[in-house]
Swiss-Prot record:
PANTHER family: MITOCHONDRIAL 28S RIBOSOMAL PROTEIN S6, SMALL RIBOSOMAL SUBUNIT PROTEIN BS6M. This is Small ribosomal subunit protein bS6. It comes from Cereibacter sphaeroides (strain ATCC 17029 / ATH 2.4.9) (Rhodobacter sphaeroides). It holds the Pfam family Ribosomal_S6. CDD domains: bS6 (cd00473). The gene is rpsF. GO terms for cellular component: cytosolic small ribosomal subunit.
């Protein structure tokens, strides 16, 4: 079996639960056809660079799978027929990256709010004279 990564975009008017239901549905399709989902991530609603089917935003989902090509083709066929799925991208990879995807790492950094460049400021004595008003 081969390793694949899939990203799909669902319509923006779906609820989060419905979007995650789509992830579960397509994972089941892979499993029914002899494959397995190694990892799945729901990236949330993101703004797209251009409109797709009159939608400016969409629910993004990411799947890592280990499946035969027939299972992947069947899942892609069903995704393209599904009214709620706007775009599908599947790539074959040599191996899956460990840990969360780059998108999830970015989200974690953003939610944490921890700025690494703030701890070394101290009392900000490195600013020097800023040409303040003097009499």
């Amino acid at each position: 079996m081969s390793l694949y990564e899939h990203v799909f975009i669902a319509r923006q008017d779906l609820s989060n639960a419905q979007a995650e239901g789509l992830i579960e549905h397509f994972s089941t399709v892979l499993a029914d056809n002899g494959g397995k989902v190694v990892d799945r991530e729901y990236w949330g609603v993101k703004t797209m660079a251009y409109k797709i089917n009159k939608n400016r935003k969409g629910h993004y989902a990411f799947l890592k799978s280990d499946a035969p090509s027939a299972a992947v083709q069947e899942m892609e066929r069903l995704m393209r027929l599904h009214d709620d799925v706007m775009r599908v991208l599947t790539i074959k990879v040599d191996k899956h990256a460990e840990g969360p995807s780059i998108q999830m790492q970015k989200r974690d950094e953003r939610e944490r709010g921890d700025r690494g460049d703030r701890s070394d400021r101290g009392d900000r004595g490195d600013r020097g004279d800023r040409g303040g008003f003097r009499r």
